[in-house]
């Protein structure tokens, strides 16, 4: 056996205990950032999702699409406004959000999985009342706070051998659509399912002890660690809501949550199925 074949065999052998750990368990992957726009990275993410399903993982893909929404709004001469990182979503903006997220982005991802031989079903939180919400703040317009996840729809799809691909749009009791932060949607879905893991793909490697030093990655963090790092200012600015989303998921019953760099090919498989790992893991 040549060296490269030996390495391949070692990688496959290394994956066995992790596959055993995850088989039959729920894993929620939140997809966003540059990994959504680069064709090769996109293909590697879809391959990872499909492989996880093939080895028996109940995998669910949740996606955002902020850059695509902003680009379409610009084309339509509709100005984008943000408050504390949340898109102010008036009636016109909400129409564009639905068109881009539930239409273009969602169906494109479902088609990509299908092209690789997967059986994907693209849906948004409106479908079947999957994500029930109420208005977060009148000033923000159609921005929703999640009340409930209808897990039966997801279980029915997963039991039928399908991969749910979910865009982060919710619905209230009066049938009004709402824009939802995709990280939050993924965390609430993972918590409702008591998922084994949630993986958040981002444009960063994880939580850094020194934001200017890529080698200062914190590979594992407890809930108490996260609070201490926030107090000390190591977790600051835009990392605070992302970390809060991860720690809230753990508090609500998700066993492990990872922030990984989606710009690394096959980052999901490396994080979940090898000894190496890539990003920051949050646990109780």
Show which residues each predicted segment covers.
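Nucleotide/pyrophosphate-binding catalytic subdomain
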Residues: 1-263, 270-272, 276, 283-284
């Amino acid at each position: 056996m040549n060296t490269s074949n030996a390495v391949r065999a070692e990688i496959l052998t290394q994956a066995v205990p992790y596959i055993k750990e995850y088989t039959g368990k729920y894993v929620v992957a939140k997809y966003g950032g540059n990994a959504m726009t680069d064709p090769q990275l996109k293909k590697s993410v879809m391959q990872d999702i499909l492989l996880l399903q093939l080895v028996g993982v109940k995998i669910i893909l949740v996606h955002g699409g902020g850059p695509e929404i902003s680009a379409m709004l610009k084309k339509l001469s509709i100005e984008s406004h943000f408050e504390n990182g949340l898109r102010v979503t008036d009636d016109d903006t909400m129409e564009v959000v639905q068109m881009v997220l539930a239409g273009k982005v969602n169906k494109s991802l479902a088609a990509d999985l299908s092209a690789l031989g997967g059986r994907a079903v693209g849906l948004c939180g409106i479908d079947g009342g999957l994500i029930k919400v109420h208005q977060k703040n009148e000033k923000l317009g159609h921005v929703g706070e999640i009340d409930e996840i209808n897990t039966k729809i997801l279980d029915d799809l997963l039991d039928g051998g399908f991969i749910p691909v979910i865009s982060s749009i919710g619905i209230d009791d009066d049938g009004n659509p709402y824009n939802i932060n995709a990280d939050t949607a993924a965390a609430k879905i993972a918590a409702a399912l008591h998922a084994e893991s949630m993986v958040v793909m981002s444009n960063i490697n994880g939580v850094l002890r020194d934001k200017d030093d890529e080698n200062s990655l914190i590979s594992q963090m407890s809930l108490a660690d996260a609070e201490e790092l926030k107090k000390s200012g190591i977790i600051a600015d835009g990392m605070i809501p992302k970390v809060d989303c991860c720690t809230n998921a753990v508090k609500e019953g998700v066993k492990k949550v990872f922030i990984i760099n989606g710009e690394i090919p096959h980052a999901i498989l490396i994080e979940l199925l090898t000894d190496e790992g890539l990003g920051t893991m949050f646990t109780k």
